[in-house]
């Protein structure tokens, strides 16, 4: 299985390479006109999953350096906590951003998106349970961040 982890130096090199090749890194909101065919250009969508503190610590400055934007999909009910969904897999706890850190993320030119409330596996969750996970996460984030 491939790792989902990219070292800070590898990430910086990836962003530098994209920039040198003429690509513009975009958040999902900024990418949508390209996906709909309303705009053309050399673009790439940049996303982060779960809202780890290390995204803020390691990626925000690099993205800003290259004038790239990104979207970080966060787990609304676990902000300021850890990746509890990984504990059963033997993966070490890692801190997740809190609301203050998310505000810094946004202030650095990045975007926040809704993952779910509790990081449930939506492929194993019925529609009746998955809809509130998604909707309530979005509502909570909108109220806290706007």
Regions of interest found by a model, annotated:
Residues 36, 55-57:
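Short N-terminal helix/helix-N-cap motif within the alpha/beta-hydrolase-1
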Residues 54-55, 122:
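Secondary-structure boundary/capping motif
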Residues 1-2, 38-44, 64-146:
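Metal-dependent polysaccharide deacetylase catalytic core of the NodB/CE4 family, i.e.
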Residues 48-51, 116:
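Active-site metal-binding loops of divalent metal-dependent hydrolases
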Residues 5-38, 142-145:
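C-terminal domain-boundary segment and adjacent tail
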Residues 14, 59, 98-101:
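Residues within well-ordered alpha-helices
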């Amino acid at each position: 299985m491939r790792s989902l982890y990219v070292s800070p130096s590898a990430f910086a090199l990836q962003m530098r390479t994209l920039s040198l090749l003429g690509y513009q890194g975009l958040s999902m909101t900024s990418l949508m006109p390209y996906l709909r065919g309303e705009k053309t250009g050399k673009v790439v969508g940049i996303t982060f999953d779960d809202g780890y503190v290390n995204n803020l610590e390691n990626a925000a400055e690099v993205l800003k350096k290259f004038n790239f934007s990104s979207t970080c999909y966060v787990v609304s009910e676990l902000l300021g906590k850890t990746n509890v969904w990984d504990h059963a897999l033997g993966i070490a706890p890692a801190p997740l951003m809190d609301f203050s850190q998310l505000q810094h993320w946004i202030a650095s030119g990045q975007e926040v998106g809704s993952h779910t409330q509790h990081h449930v596996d939506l492929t194993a969750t019925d529609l009746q349970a998955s809809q509130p996970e998604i909707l309530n996460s979005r509502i909570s984030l909108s109220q806290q961040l706007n």
